[in-house]
């Protein structure tokens, strides 16, 4: 049969006068590329279907193909999902249209809690927790996308206000809630203001209006921000440096935080977690300007439990040994954050206050300053017990509010959180993750490829 086919092919003759090249490239003897062949497939099929008319090919012209349009950033992909932009501006529920967000890092319980991994009753309880876990995972995915962009975007010489607003605008864009209407910021958005604490300042620093500070190449900057979805707060922080001389300081905090998370679990005592953290942290040292310095835990800073709309839920997780014998419990959410320092390892209040939060158990007292009443009404509607900063009040159009704000603080209704600093000339670093104690495992919600 093969011989017959060969003979038939040999007898075939092409009428060159009636045959026209498909394209200019073919006329010139050039071979089409693989992509061109792929794109031409539809046209080839059309040509085959219209075979009777092909004999009149000399009289007819082939249709010109329209060039394919390139997809824009943020355009819909497979299944209607969009891709994220830089800076992040596509709502996260458009990137994950089915509301199915990635799980955090799963860590199994060990020792006396190992049975929880396979226990059927615990697995049933775990399946019942999907609703609130979806909200946590959504917030965690927003945190990951924003911080991964921020780590590439932040450069020496940038102003702190520009950095803070860049992060916060991205979080608000991804949640789809700008926080300008009454109550909008309580649906989703910032879990607390973006902390940008530099060098000896360890925590609670964000720029107020008019701040001219910039981050320099030789600085060590802690970037700490939270994302919340319906009051489920994901709290995570990293330390940003440009000079590799500080790598050991940064790595000490990362390793200590991971040790704390590994030790944590249902019925584990806080003191045991603190001991595990301190052992790892203080095994590091860092050489700065020719001097070898030990890395110390900042002993009066702690991790904490996280409540609904409450960043500090009542339990503290120490980062040094001894002390608190309180146990962790099933279903609780914690932020383990560790701070390392080349200074004294002890912080105090310093610099201008920027962070505030209304107390959950705020007393009902008569306010003598009229601006305090107006401000309290706005804080209650827009933030509730979520922390806020002065820039947020400026953004909402409040003017000349400082007297009223100080009145709310002195009345015990609002708590002020001043920056926390070690001795000048020292360097501090931070690492933090949020995790939930599920019935069958620990889920490190904020874990990402970056840290």
UniProtKB/Swiss-Prot annotation:
Residues 37-51 have a biased composition (Acidic residues). It comes from Pyrenophora tritici-repentis (strain Pt-1C-BFP) (Wheat tan spot fungus). Residues 1-101 are annotated as: Disordered. Keywords: Aminopeptidase, Cytoplasm, Hydrolase, Metal-binding, Protease. A divalent metal cation 1 binds at residues 224, 235, 432. GO terms for biological process: proteolysis. HAMAP family: MetAP_2_euk. SUPFAM superfamilies: Creatinase/aminopeptidase, Winged helix' DNA-binding domain. This is Methionine aminopeptidase 2-2. GO terms for cellular component: cytoplasm. Its EC number is 3.4.11.18.
